[in-house]
């Protein structure tokens, strides 16, 4: 799963603003902001945002044992 911190990091890594991500995921800018603040979103909305970021080359990682999380950026996304 993706959390709000990962969303913000992924968006920054891609050089996207809140508006670009919102438009790509067909959600409001307020929805993206709420996610990045740590508020709960409906599963379908969260999945839509995550899928857009994954299609742009982001891989979400998390370590269940200690709660660590982050992102990976596929090399092909850095062109």
Give the label of every model feature segment.
Residues 1-2:
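A detector for short, charged/polar N-terminal pre-domain segments
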Residues 5-20:
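Short basic helix-loop element that most often maps to the first helix and adjoining turn
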Residues 7, 21-22, 32-35:
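Conserved hydrophobic/aromatic packing and binding residues within compact polymer-binding modules
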Residues 12, 23, 37:
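Alpha-helical residues within the helix-turn-helix
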Residues 12, 26, 43-61:
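DNA major-groove recognition helix of helix-turn-helix/homeodomain DNA-binding modules
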Residues 20, 35, 42, 55:
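Major-groove DNA-recognition helix of helix-turn-helix-type DNA-binding domains
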């Amino acid at each position: 799963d993706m959390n709000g911190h990962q969303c913000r990091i992924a968006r920054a890594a891609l050089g996207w603003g809140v508006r670009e991500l919102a438009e790509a995921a067909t959600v409001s800018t307020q929805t993206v902001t709420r996610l990045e603040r740590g508020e709960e979103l409906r599963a379908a909305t969260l999945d839509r945002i995550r899928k857009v970021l994954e299609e742009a080359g982001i891989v979400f990682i998390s370590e269940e044992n200690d709660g660590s999380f982050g992102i990976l950026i596929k090399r092909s996304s850095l062109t």
